[in-house]
């Protein structure tokens, strides 16, 4: 028997978030959405932790790099949540910095 995977998406573009949540939900994943960094960081301090964080780089309150840095500084298992950074920025240096800040992978937005 398989266990459903739980993801958290921190994304301020509501339309994109709705599409991702619907697509992943239709494929058997449970996805919670937070529209900003502050609510996302609060969610990451609750149990159960997500199996993956999908994190936008450009958010209205804190950027995704700062969210990633703060996540990695949290005590316990929260610091180990895998992070997939998602952004519209195409600069290769953004990828390098994102990975240095603790992201596990980095994908450009379509």
Where are these regions (language model features)?
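N-terminal/domain-start alpha-helical segments
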Residues: 1-110
């Amino acid at each position: 028997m398989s266990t459903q995977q739980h993801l958290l998406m921190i994304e301020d573009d509501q339309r994109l978030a709705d599409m991702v949540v619907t697509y992943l939900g239709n494929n058997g994943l449970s996805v919670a959405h937070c529209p900003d960094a502050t609510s996302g960081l609060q969610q990451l301090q609750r149990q159960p932790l997500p199996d993956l964080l999908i994190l936008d780089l450009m958010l209205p309150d804190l950027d995704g790099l700062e969210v990633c840095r703060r996540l990695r500084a949290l005590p316990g298992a929260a610091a180990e949540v895998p992070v997939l950074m998602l952004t519209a920025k195409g600069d290769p240096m953004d990828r390098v910095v994102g990975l240095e800040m603790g992201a596990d992978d980095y994908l450009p937005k379509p």
